[in-house]
């Protein structure tokens, strides 16, 4: 005899709250979810998350510092940093022969540190 399991991931009947649905649909209008999705895609790369975390720990780091931290070449570090800069996760400033990177703003730091705290809760139970 085969055991039947209920699907707990979906409603058993289709019924929705029209007022709630219309309110939320209205709130979705005009939002730039494509840019938000792009930001999360860039952060889906483990190396870039490490770089972003490093930038949370220090006010700024030069490309050489980042390369040393992640154990790669300056060119590779610069490539990853460019992705972070293009989506306003990080910003850069050239000083003489060095380029320094920092987080674009406090929102990014909050986002990253909140995600890290959430992940740590999962691991620690």
Regions found by a protein language model. Give the residues of each.
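N-terminal leader segment of winged-helix/HTH proteins
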Residues: 1-43
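A general structural signal for short secondary-structure boundary/capping elements
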Residues: 12-13, 85-88, 118-119
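N-terminal helix-turn-helix DNA-binding core of bacterial DNA-binding proteins
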Residues: 26-73, 99-106
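Base-recognition residues in the alpha-helical recognition helix of bacterial helix-turn-helix
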Residues: 53, 79-82
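Conserved segment of winged-helix/HTH DNA-binding domains
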Residues: 57, 100-125
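DNA-recognition element of transcription regulators
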Residues: 75-77
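Beta-hairpin "wing" of winged helix-turn-helix
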Residues: 85-95, 102
């Amino acid at each position: 005899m085969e055991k039947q399991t209920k699907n707990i991931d979906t409603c058993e009947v289709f019924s929705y709250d029209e007022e709630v649905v219309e309110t939320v649909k209205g709130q979705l209008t005009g939002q730039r979810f494509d840019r938000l999705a792009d930001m999360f895609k860039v952060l889906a790369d483990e190396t870039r998350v490490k770089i972003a975390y490093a930038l949370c720990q220090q006010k700024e780091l030069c490309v050489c510092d980042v390369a040393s931290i992640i154990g790669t070449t300056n060119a590779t570090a610069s490539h990853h940093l460019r992705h972070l800069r293009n989506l306003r996760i990080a910003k850069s400033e050239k000083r003489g022969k060095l380029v320094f990177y920092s987080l674009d703003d406090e929102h990014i730091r909050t986002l990253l540190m909140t995600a890290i705290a959430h992940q740590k809760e999962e691991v620690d139970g």
